[in-house]
Design a protein with these regions (language model features):
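NAD(P)+-binding Rossmann beta1-loop-alpha1 motif at the extreme N-terminus of oxidoreductases
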Residues: 1-62, 82, 86, 122
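Rossmann-fold dinucleotide-binding core
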Residues: 3, 94-173
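Hydrophobic beta-strand scaffold residues
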Residues: 27, 47, 113-114, 155, ...
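Residues in the short beta-alpha loop(s) of Rossmann-like NAD(P)-binding domains
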Residues: 32-33, 67, 137
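Rossmann-fold NAD(P) dinucleotide-binding segment
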Residues: 51-112
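Helical "substrate-binding/catalytic lid" subdomain
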Residues: 163-288
C-alpha cells in the first residue's frame, strides 16, 4: 500500500520514520518545514510539494497536525483527489466533533475515514510502541491495522468515528490530573526536605505509583524540560476535554484545576517546554 504522511512534527517525524523503514511500497511526505521533509527523504521517503500531491499519489493518507483548524485545512485541500480507492487516517488530537464533521466530508468522496490519535510521547514514537485509539468502521480498522502496527503496539478500536478521539481526550485528562497530583505532593515533599528522586522511590512502592512519575522524575530532578510532549499541546487537550464535558453536562472539577495550571503555564511562556515543566507553576504557588 502506498502511504502518504502529512505533518512531520515532534511525533509525526518519528512515526513516519517507522513507516518508511517498514513499508515495502513508496511513502510520500509533506511538511511546511523543509528540514523535516529532508530527514525523511534521507530514510527513503518521497517528498511532495503539498498535501494535495501526497493525497493524489497515496492509497492511504495519514495526517498528524497540531489542531482542528489544521486538520480541516488539509481535508479541504485534498478532497478533490479522494475516491473510493483511498483511506484517510487522521492521527491528530483534535476536537471530536470536528473529526466527525471531517469524516462525513471525506466519506462523501467514497473514501473511508478513521481517527487514530496516539498516546505516549516521542520516545515511544521512535520505538514504534505508541498506543493508538481508533474511531471508524471495523472494515476500515482492519484495513489500516498493519500500517498502524508499524507505529504502535497497543491498538484498540473504540467504536465509530470520533470515538478514538474521545478516548484520547479522556486519557490525557487523566494524565493531567495525575500530573497535577504529582506536582502538588512532590512540591510539598520538597518544601519539607524530601527531594524528587527520594519521593519517587517511595511512591513507587505504594498505591500512588504511576507511569508519569516513573518516566519524568529524572527530568524534573534535573530541571530538563526538553520537549517530548509540549505544554501547549496538553493545554489544548485539557480545554478540548472541558468543552466535551460541558457538551455532556458533566462537571469535572479536577480537570478544571489542571486547566488552571496549564493556563498559568501558557501565560508564563512555558508553552514550548515539555509538559512536566508545569511543576514550575505549582511549586511557586502560595496559599490563598
Amino acid at each position: 500500500m502506498k502511504i502518504g504522511f502529512i505533518g512531520l512534527g515532534i511525533m509525526g517525524e518519528a512515526m513516519c520514520r517507522n513507516i518508511v523503514r517498514k513499508n515495502e511500497d513508496p511513502v510520500y511526505v509533506f511538511d511546511f518545514v523543509q528540514e523535516k521533509v529532508d530527514l525523511l527523504v534521507k530514510e527513503g521517503a518521497i517528498a511532495c510539494l503539498n498535501s494535495w500531491e501526497v493525497a493524489e499519489k497515496a492509497d492511504m493518507i495519514i495526517t498528524m497536525v497540531p489542531k482542528s483548524e489544521h486538520s480541516r485545512a488539509v481535508v479541504n485541500e485534498v478532497l478533490p483527489v479522494l475516491s473510493e480507492t483511498k483511506i484517510y487516517v487522521d492521527m491528530s488530537t483534535i476536537d471530536p466533533d470536528v473529526s466527525v464533521e471531517l469524516s462525513e466530508m471525506v466519506k462523501k468522496t467514497g473514501a473511508d475515514f478513521l481517527d487514530a490519535p496516539v498516546v505516549k510521547s516521542r520516545p515511544a514514537a521512535e520505538a514504534g510502541k505508541l498506543g493508538i485509539y481508533v474511531g471508524g468502521s471495523e472494515e476500515g480498522y482492519q484495513r489500516i491495522l498493519p500500517v498502524l502496527s508499524y507505529m504502535g503496539e497497543n491498538i484498540i478500536r473504540m467504536g465509530d468515528n470520533g470515538k478514538g478521539l474521545i478516548m484520547k481526550i479522556c486519557h490525557n485528562a487523566l494524565v493531567s490530573q495525575i500530573q497535577n497530583g504529582v506536582n502538588e505532593t512532590s512540591a510539598l515533599a520538597a518544601k519539607n526536605g524530601i527531594d524528587i528522586l527520594t519521593y519517587a522511590e517511595a511512591i513507587s512502592y505504594g498505591g500512588g505509583q504511576n507511569f508519569y512519575l516513573d518516566s519524568k522524575k529524572n527530568a524534573i530532578a534535573n530541571e530538563d524540560y526538553t520537549t517530548a510532549f509540549s505544554i501547549a499541546n496538553m493545554h489544548k487537550d485539557v480545554h478540548i476535554c472541558l468543552n466535551l464535558a460541558k457538551q455532556s453536562e458533566l462537571a469535572m472539577p479536577g480537570e478544571e484545576n489542571a486547566a488552571r495550571v496549564y493556563d498559568e503555564a501558557m501565560e508564563k511562556g512555558y508553552g514550548p517546554e515539555d509538559f512536566c515543566a508545569t511543576i514550575k507553576v505549582v511549586k511557586d504557588r502560595k496559599p490563598c
